[in-house]
């Protein structure tokens, strides 16, 4: 068996992509539906089925409350941080634990990590089908501006999906890696502008002799293509209410129709100046059914979304400033993510950087390609490439007066480790509470709490005397580990930051087992579907043969075939694999017997045999060519066939 591959997965808000290194080059893998991108959508049906990807998307309008999309916008977040997202989804978002998030469906409650894991399992299966071998290792990408909790939650999703996450890397960095993979001898400074379905990132990198060094990163994890869709949706709802007096925002299935229509309109407006939005039978009142029929121009779309486009400007300017560069210093601007196709977005990029953006990369696939390259580096398949990423946000602890004291500044190259000595704030203090923070604000309360832990057993001493060394360690995944040590006694307390909105180890293990069980169930379901499809094909073929055979087969055989076709169709409806396989065997035998008879009737010499040959009489049959005492015997025309000359 060949060496195990490390696949690269772009786990996107809207779509996901999987890639792998083959023969020294990255290959984007098609899924079972023949597409290179897979919708990041999971649905639970009334029959108990779990649908992933395009199949889930296809039934979303009729099953809106059980179809989970854009789960990435909730991953690693607390419920009070998801208010804007919750307003615009068709499914129910509820509290998980103290502060976390879950999705409520007819099949049960699921965390964003579990939903993301289902998508990752689809990516894993896609890679395994392509490679013909089991896959257990992956590099998964995240938005550069994801905080520690979001990174940890993404890694947990990978574990639930049965993957060892070898590395979490930032999406813009992965894109730069893909862009510069064949340009190792080029020294340049590039900006990667990444506007995806749910997040926005801007990263400034320097490429030199195969070294990809991130100089700075910035972004907005509440901004993406979904927000552009929402702007169109809100306009449609408002316009329809003005026209009819009816509010169509309450019905979940209607909202799903509006969402899909808005997304379609957004895509069309990237290539045309106006688009027609037509949704028949959108609702009804006492006067009858109502239809939504509107024209949206690009000018109106630009007006509706101007504030969203403008929100990307300041992060770009901040990233340039943090990198110590001017816009004129940037050699190339790489566009990543589906939303960069919006003309107003491209125009803003041109204004900010003073140059036309580079459109040479596929914005939908480039991130997964970069992840595959990093997987190749970790697997030893790729050499002469070094990736130096950064932490997007500053890290520190709360100190006296509620101030945040930073230990690691944002845009510090990772992995990194830094220590600082603190002391007690009161006499005879026997314990210190370490409040770990992430953010850029001066006051602790204005930043994000990553976790808290206590160092106890400090010997009594006047305040300021004990020496407490706090160490922050950020690994290559951007995940934080913190320790506190009393230098006087040597006592130490270490933690890996686990957020209140995250998952415990027990919860992760339970979800891993659930996912494995679902994988087995999904495999069994797939086998049933394949068997049903095969039986359906056999049934159709037999029915066609019987209809075309005419009088070449007898009435008894026709009835036998008709009865078997009926039993086969009942088996198809049963979803019972054993019954389906039995029906396949029966119908195959009948089909073979009938086909043989039809063939023998149609074969050269069959007509001669039926007429009794040149010197004989026709055999008794329903045609009446021969009757009692040989009456009505007719001469048959025939041709002598010499088999030796055939």
Swiss-Prot record:
Give the function comment from the record: Acts as a chaperone.
Q: What is this protein called?
A: Chaperone protein DnaK
Q: Which InterPro entries did the record assign?
A: ATPase_NBD (IPR043129), Chaperone_DnaK (IPR012725), Heat_shock_70_CS (IPR018181), HSP70_C_sf (IPR029048), HSP70_peptide-bd_sf (IPR029047), Hsp_70_fam (IPR013126)
Give the family per the record: Belongs to the heat shock protein 70 family.
Query: Superkingdom of the source?
Result: Bacteria
Transport: is it a keyword of this entry? no
Report residue spans for region: Disordered.
598-646
Which SUPFAM superfamilies would you find in this protein's record?
Actin-like ATPase domain, Heat shock protein 70kD (HSP70), C-terminal subdomain, Heat shock protein 70kD (HSP70), peptide-binding domain
Q: What is the lineage of its organism?
A: Bacteria, Pseudomonadati, Spirochaetota, Spirochaetia, Leptospirales
Q: Which GO terms describe its biological process?
A: chaperone cofactor-dependent protein refolding; protein refolding
PTM sites of type Phosphothreonine:
199
Q: Which UniProt keywords apply?
A: ATP-binding, Chaperone, Nucleotide-binding, Phosphoprotein, Stress response
Native organism: Leptospira interrogans serogroup Icterohaemorrhagiae serovar Lai (strain 56601)
Q: What induces it?
A: By stress conditions e.g. heat shock.
The record's CDD domains line, in alphabetical order, gives:
ASKHA_NBD_HSP70_DnaK-like
- Which molecular function GO terms apply here? ATP binding; ATP hydrolysis activity; ATP-dependent protein folding chaperone; heat shock protein binding; protein folding chaperone; unfolded protein binding
Q: Where is the composition biased (Low complexity)?
A: 600-621
Family annotation (Gene3D superfamilies): 1.20.1270.10, 3.30.420.40, Actin, Chain A, domain 4, Substrate Binding Domain Of DNAk, Chain A, domain 1
């Amino acid at each position: 068996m060949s060496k195990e591959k490390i696949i690269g997965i772009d786990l996107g808000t809207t779509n996901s992509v999987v890639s792998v290194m083959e023969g020294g080059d990255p290959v984007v893998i098609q899924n079972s539906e023949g597409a290179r991108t897979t919708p990041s959508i999971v649905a639970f049906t009334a029959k108990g089925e779990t649908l992933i990807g395009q199949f889930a998307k296809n039934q979303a309008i009729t099953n809106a409350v059980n179809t989970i999309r854009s789960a990435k916008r909730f991953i690693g977040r607390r419920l009070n941080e998801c208010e804007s997202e919750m307003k615009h989804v068709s499914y129910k978002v509820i509290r998980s634990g103290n502060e976390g998030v879950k999705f409520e469906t007819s099949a049960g409650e699921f965390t964003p990590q579990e939903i993301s894991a289902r998508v990752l399992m689809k990516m894993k299966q896609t890679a395994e089908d392509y490679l013909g071998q089991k896959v257990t290792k992956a590099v998964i990408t995240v938005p550069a501006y994801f905080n520690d909790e979001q990174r940890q939650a993404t890694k947990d999703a990978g574990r639930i999906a049965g993957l060892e996450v070898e590395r979490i890397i930032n999406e813009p960095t992965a894109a730069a890696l893909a862009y510069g993979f064949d340009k190792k001898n080029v020294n340049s400074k590039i900006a990667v502008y990444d506007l995806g379905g749910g997040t926005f990132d801007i990263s400034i990198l320097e490429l030199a002799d195969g070294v990809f060094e991130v100089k700075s990163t910035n972004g907005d994890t509440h901004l993406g293509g979904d927000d552009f869709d929402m702007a169109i949706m809100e306009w449609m709802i408002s316009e329809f209410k003005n026209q009819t007096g009816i509010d169509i925002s309450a019905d979940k299935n209607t909202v799903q129709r509006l969402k899909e229509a808005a997304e379609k309109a957004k895509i069309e407006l990237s290539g045309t100046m106006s688009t027609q939005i037509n949704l028949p039978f959108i609702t009804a009142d006492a006067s009858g059914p109502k239809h939504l029929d509107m024209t949206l121009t690009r000018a109106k779309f630009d007006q509706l979304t101007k504030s969203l486009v403008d929100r990307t400007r300041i992060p770009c300017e901040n990233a340039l400033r943090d990198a110590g560069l001017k816009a004129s210093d940037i050699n190339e601007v790489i566009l990543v993510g589906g939303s960069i196709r919006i003309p107003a977005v491209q125009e803003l990029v041109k204004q900010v950087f003073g140059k036309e953006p580079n459109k040479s990369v596929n914005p939908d696939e480039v991130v997964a390609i970069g992840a595959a390259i990093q997987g190749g580096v970790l697997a030893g398949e790729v050499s002469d490439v070094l990736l130096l990423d950064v932490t997007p946000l500053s890290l520190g602890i709360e100190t006296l007066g509620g101030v945040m004291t930073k230990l690691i500044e944002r845009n510090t190259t990772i992995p990194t480790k830094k220590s600082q000595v603190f002391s007690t704030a009161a006499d005879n203090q026997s314990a210190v509470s370490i409040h770990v923070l992430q953010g850029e604000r001066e006051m602790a309360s204005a930043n994000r709490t990553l976790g808290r832990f206590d160092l106890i057993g400090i010997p009594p001493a006047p305040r300021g005397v004990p020496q407490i060394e706090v160490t922050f360690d950020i690994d290559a995944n951007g995940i934080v580990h913190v320790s506190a040590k009393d230098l006087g006694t040597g006592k130490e307390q270490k933690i890996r930051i686990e957020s209140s909105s995250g998952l415990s180890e027990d919860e992760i293990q339970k979800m891993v087992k659930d996912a494995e069980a679902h994988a087995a169930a999904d495999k069994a379901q797939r086998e049933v579907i394949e068997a049903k499809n095969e039986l359906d094909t056999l049934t159709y073929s037999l029915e066609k043969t019987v209809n075309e055979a005419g009088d070449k087969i007898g009435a008894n055989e026709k009835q036998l075939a008709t009865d078997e076709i009926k039993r086969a169709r009942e088996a198809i409806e049963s979803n019972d694999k054993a019954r389906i396989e039995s029906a396949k065997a029966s119908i195959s035998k009948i089909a073979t017997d009938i086909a043989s008879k039809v063939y023998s009737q149609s074969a050269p010499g069959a007509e001669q045999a039926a007429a009794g040959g040149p010197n004989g009489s026709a055999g008794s049959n329903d045609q009446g060519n021969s009757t009692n005492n040989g009456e009505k015997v007719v001469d048959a025309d025939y041709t002598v066939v010499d088999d030796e000359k055939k």
